[in-house]
Swiss-Prot record:
Its main location: mitochondrion. Belongs to the SDHAF2 family. Interacts with the flavoprotein subunit within the SDH catalytic dimer. This is Succinate dehydrogenase assembly factor 2, mitochondrial. GO terms for biological process: mitochondrial electron transport, succinate to ubiquinone; mitochondrial respiratory chain complex II assembly; protein-FAD linkage; tricarboxylic acid cycle.
Length: 162
């Protein structure tokens, strides 16, 4: 691929994509969470998800869990999800019981864009898994994302989480 399509290789690398396995004659590149390949036919699923298993935390004190969830809500990597989850966490995290914290922790282990699309009810782009269909927490996040007060969202100050 590097020799066959130097302009494409340079363009993809400048945009943060990584070219892999160019010796096989097929092109494959990554944009972080999704892999694309040129050797699939029209009937194949072109996008394959990469999922990293979350760390199993046992006996984590609630104050440490809340602190970790605040950090994970604020530092997602995608601005839209950062703003949405950080505001949601600032408003609701301190009121959550242990079961709700576990559910929120599980939600944060999902892909950023999936969380964003589910929160904004864009199920055409990212279908909602059965696991989250009856989630009160996700419904609360969806209601929060409607921004009925029409506030301009920004990253909440850390004092808002107390």
């Amino acid at each position: 691929m590097h020799n066959m399509f130097p302009a494409l290789t340079k363009t993809l690398s400048l945009q943060g994509y990584k070219i892999i396995n160019s010796q096989t004659g097929s092109a494959a590149w990554s944009c972080g969470r999704r892999w694309f390949s040129s050797d699939k036919d029209d009937h194949d699923d072109v996008v394959t998800r990469i999922k990293i298993s979350p760390i199993k935390r046992t006996n984590e004190p609630l104050d440490k869990k809340r602190a970790r969830l605040i950090y994970q809500s604020r530092k997602r990597g995608i601005l839209e999800t950062d703003l949405l989850l950080s505001g949601f966490a600032a408003k609701y995290l301190k009121k959550m019981n242990e079961e709700e914290l576990e559910e929120y922790d599980s939600l944060l282990n999902e892909l950023d864009w999936d969380i964003y699309y589910w929160a904004t009810k864009n199920f055409k782009t990212s279908p909602l898994p059965d696991k989250w269909a009856n989630s009160k927490l996700l419904k609360q996040l969806q209601e929060f994302s409607e921004n009925k007060e029409k506030e301009i969202l920004s990253m909440p100050d850390l004092s808002k989480y107390q």
